[in-house]
Protein backbone atom coordinates (compact mmCIF):
# COMPACT_ATOMS: atom_id res chain seq x y z
CA UNK A 1 0.00 0.00 0.00
CA UNK A 2 1.17 3.49 -0.77
CA UNK A 3 0.94 5.82 2.20
CA UNK A 4 0.52 9.56 1.92
CA UNK A 5 2.65 12.32 3.32
CA UNK A 6 1.74 11.50 6.91
CA UNK A 7 2.02 8.47 9.14
CA UNK A 8 -0.41 8.48 12.06
CA UNK A 9 1.12 7.31 15.33
CA UNK A 10 -0.53 6.74 18.71
CA UNK A 11 1.38 6.33 21.95
CA UNK A 12 -0.28 5.14 25.15
CA UNK A 13 0.70 4.38 28.71
CA UNK A 14 -1.68 1.48 29.31
CA UNK A 15 -0.83 0.64 32.95
CA UNK A 16 -0.98 -3.08 32.27
CA UNK A 17 -2.83 -5.21 29.73
CA UNK A 18 -3.05 -8.50 31.59
CA UNK A 19 -6.81 -8.18 32.23
CA UNK A 20 -8.73 -9.66 29.26
CA UNK A 21 -11.49 -7.02 29.33
CA UNK A 22 -8.99 -4.15 29.26
CA UNK A 23 -7.00 -5.82 26.48
CA UNK A 24 -10.11 -6.33 24.30
CA UNK A 25 -11.39 -2.79 24.85
CA UNK A 26 -7.98 -1.41 24.03
CA UNK A 27 -7.80 -3.51 20.83
CA UNK A 28 -11.24 -2.28 19.72
CA UNK A 29 -10.22 1.32 20.40
CA UNK A 30 -7.02 0.98 18.36
CA UNK A 31 -8.96 -0.48 15.43
CA UNK A 32 -11.32 2.52 15.51
CA UNK A 33 -8.43 5.01 15.65
CA UNK A 34 -6.73 3.20 12.75
CA UNK A 35 -3.15 4.52 13.13
CA UNK A 36 -0.20 3.15 11.17
CA UNK A 37 1.97 2.69 14.28
CA UNK A 38 1.08 2.30 17.95
CA UNK A 39 3.50 2.54 20.88
CA UNK A 40 2.52 1.06 24.25
CA UNK A 41 4.25 1.65 27.55
CA UNK A 42 3.76 -0.13 30.89
CA UNK A 43 2.25 -3.28 29.36
CA UNK A 44 3.23 -5.38 32.42
CA UNK A 45 3.70 -8.46 30.23
CA UNK A 46 6.29 -11.12 30.93
CA UNK A 47 7.96 -12.73 27.89
CA UNK A 48 5.64 -15.74 28.12
CA UNK A 49 2.53 -13.48 28.12
CA UNK A 50 3.11 -11.59 24.87
CA UNK A 51 0.88 -13.92 22.85
CA UNK A 52 -2.09 -12.30 24.62
CA UNK A 53 -1.69 -9.02 22.76
CA UNK A 54 -3.60 -9.44 19.50
CA UNK A 55 -5.31 -6.86 17.31
CA UNK A 56 -7.03 -7.70 14.03
CA UNK A 57 -5.04 -6.09 11.20
CA UNK A 58 -1.84 -5.91 13.27
CA UNK A 59 0.45 -8.92 12.80
CA UNK A 60 3.66 -6.96 13.46
CA UNK A 61 3.75 -6.67 17.25
CA UNK A 62 7.14 -6.32 18.93
CA UNK A 63 7.74 -6.44 22.68
CA UNK A 64 10.42 -5.73 25.25
CA UNK A 65 9.53 -7.30 28.60
CA UNK A 66 11.17 -8.24 31.85
CA UNK A 67 10.56 -11.36 33.91
CA UNK A 68 8.26 -9.54 36.34
CA UNK A 69 4.90 -7.92 35.64
CA UNK A 70 6.23 -4.38 35.51
CA UNK A 71 7.38 -1.93 32.84
CA UNK A 72 7.18 -3.43 29.35
CA UNK A 73 6.92 -1.67 26.01
CA UNK A 74 5.52 -2.67 22.63
CA UNK A 75 5.47 -1.34 19.09
CA UNK A 76 2.61 -2.35 16.81
CA UNK A 77 2.84 -1.74 13.08
CA UNK A 78 -0.34 -1.95 11.04
CA UNK A 79 -0.68 -4.51 8.25
CA UNK A 80 -1.84 -1.69 5.95
CA UNK A 81 1.75 -0.42 5.87
CA UNK A 82 4.55 -2.23 4.04
CA UNK A 83 7.18 -2.02 6.78
CA UNK A 84 10.36 -3.99 6.21
CA UNK A 85 12.36 -4.74 9.36
CA UNK A 86 16.15 -4.49 9.32
CA UNK A 87 17.08 -4.66 13.03
CA UNK A 88 15.41 -4.82 16.43
CA UNK A 89 17.19 -3.76 19.62
CA UNK A 90 15.54 -4.21 23.01
CA UNK A 91 16.22 -4.63 26.68
CA UNK A 92 14.24 -6.24 29.51
CA UNK A 93 11.19 -4.00 29.37
CA UNK A 94 12.27 -0.38 29.10
CA UNK A 95 12.97 0.16 25.41
CA UNK A 96 12.66 -1.27 21.94
CA UNK A 97 14.15 0.26 18.78
CA UNK A 98 13.22 -0.98 15.31
CA UNK A 99 15.10 0.07 12.20
CA UNK A 100 13.43 -0.62 8.90
CA UNK A 101 12.01 0.92 5.78
CA UNK A 102 8.69 2.09 4.38
CA UNK A 103 8.48 2.38 0.61
CA UNK A 104 12.28 2.10 0.48
CA UNK A 105 12.73 5.06 2.87
CA UNK A 106 14.70 4.24 6.03
CA UNK A 107 12.90 4.83 9.30
CA UNK A 108 13.71 4.18 12.95
CA UNK A 109 10.97 3.86 15.55
CA UNK A 110 11.79 3.76 19.25
CA UNK A 111 9.62 3.24 22.30
CA UNK A 112 11.30 4.14 25.59
CA UNK A 113 9.84 3.82 29.07
CA UNK A 114 12.38 5.64 31.25
CA UNK A 115 12.41 5.59 35.06
CA UNK A 116 10.91 8.62 36.83
CA UNK A 117 14.22 9.51 38.43
CA UNK A 118 17.25 9.96 36.19
CA UNK A 119 15.36 9.78 32.88
CA UNK A 120 17.82 12.00 30.91
CA UNK A 121 20.79 9.87 31.99
CA UNK A 122 18.88 6.67 31.23
CA UNK A 123 17.94 7.82 27.74
CA UNK A 124 21.50 8.91 26.94
CA UNK A 125 22.63 5.32 27.71
CA UNK A 126 20.09 3.79 25.30
Locate each region found by the language model.
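A shared catalytic/ligand-binding motif for oxyanion handling
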Residues: 1-126
Amino acid sequence: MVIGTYISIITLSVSGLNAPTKRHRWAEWIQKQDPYICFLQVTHFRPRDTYRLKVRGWKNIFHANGNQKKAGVAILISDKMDFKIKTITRDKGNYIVIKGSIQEEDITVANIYAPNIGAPQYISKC
